[in-house]
Amino acid sequence: MIDLEVYVEKERHNPLLRRREVYCRLSFEGKTPSRKEVRGKIAGLMNAEPERVVVDYIKTEFGKTEAKCYVKIYDTVEDLQKIEEEHIIERNKVEEQAEEAEEAEAGAAE
């Protein structure tokens, strides 16, 4: 697990789309954190289930251990499925499956 700190810069409630929009700054050591790690940290910080959290982007500057991040927290999973674009949903799912495969390979190698 990466040492990750999250600083919420702006939070906005969007009642029309039934979600909260969070702009935050990430501070970390080493490599840029994955969407799964950011989603888990923000879900814990904002008291939301990880299934309702979508990481839209993580932008880093070359050579810095900081990144800017935009996250959407939907009221329900159904709202997320109806409103969010398919490629964004897949982008947030694919990393989960890839990391699970890596963990399975690491367990098999031992």
UniProtKB/Swiss-Prot annotation:
The gene is rps24e. Residues 97-110 have a biased composition (Acidic residues). It comes from the Archaea. Signal peptide: none annotated. One of its GO terms (biological process) is translation. SUPFAM superfamilies: Ribosomal proteins S24e, L23 and L15e. HAMAP family: Ribosomal_eS24 (MF_00545). This is Small ribosomal subunit protein eS24.
